[in-house]
Design a protein with these regions (language model features):
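Short loop/turn and low-complexity linker motifs enriched in small/turn-promoting residues
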Residues: 20-196
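C-terminal motif of bacterial Sec signal peptides marking the signal peptidase cleavage site
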Residues: 15-19
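Bacterial N-terminal signal peptides that target proteins for export
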Residues: 1-8
């Protein structure tokens, strides 16, 4: 039984590393883009799970009326997003949409796990805040080996071409998110102290 479990873990690890990456994103050329500054915070969206590796998850900032593309987060990838200190709202889109609220501080790095779950016709995704205590877990060490990706003209074109569908999902699913209990919303909120 242990041998079977070890083989399953190895196979899923290989799938995670070699999973389908979006051709609309490129590896980060300058890692200065992922470092917070005295007047900015960095929110890292990471998708370590191999589940649903063939499907892409697209993350936006939806703090204002505009859907600002964060990036296409593939299985086994990390996308860093620089933003201002304060409270922000993020959305992940696939078959449906899910939201996460984040309050971030300058000169800090925060992590959000893009988590796949089974949908009706395809994989759906949720945004889960990574709490400060999770940085001590072995799983976080594995994330350090995941590649950094950033947007290209192709990813921005995809966002533009799919803007109507994305907005429709935002409107439909934000109503559902707004109706969640205070406890459920708290679980989907990244706190200022949750930085690395």
């Amino acid at each position: 039984m242990r041998i079977v479990m070890a083989l399953v873990i190895i196979v899923f690890s290989l799938i995670s590393v070699s999973g389908c990456k979006s051709s609309a994103m490129v590896k980060v050329a300058d890692e200065a883009a992922i470092v917070p500054t005295a007047d900015s915070a960095v929110v890292v969206f990471v998708r370590p799970s191999p589940v649903g590796y063939a499907y892409q998850s697209v993350v936006y900032e939806t703090t204002t009326e505009e859907n600002q593309l964060v990036g296409i987060v593939s299985s086994g990838a990390r996308v860093a997003y620089r933003t201002t200190p304060g409270t922000h709202m993020f959305m992940v889109v696939s078959e449906a949409a899910d939201f996460l609220q984040a309050t971030v501080e300058a000169n800090k790095t925060y992590y959000v796990r893009v988590t796949p779950r089974i949908g009706v016709f395809r994989v759906r995704f949720s945004l889960d805040p990574v709490r400060a205590e999770e940085f001590k877990q072995p799983e976080f060490g594995f994330w350090g080996g995941l590649e950094w990706y950033e947007n290209t003209d192709a990813s921005r074109a995809w966002a533009k071409n799919n803007a109507a569908s994305v907005q429709s999902k935002r409107e439909e699913y934000f109503k559902k998110w707004s109706e969640k209990s205070a406890a459920d919303k708290a679980e989907a909120t990244l706190l200022p102290g949750d930085h690395r």
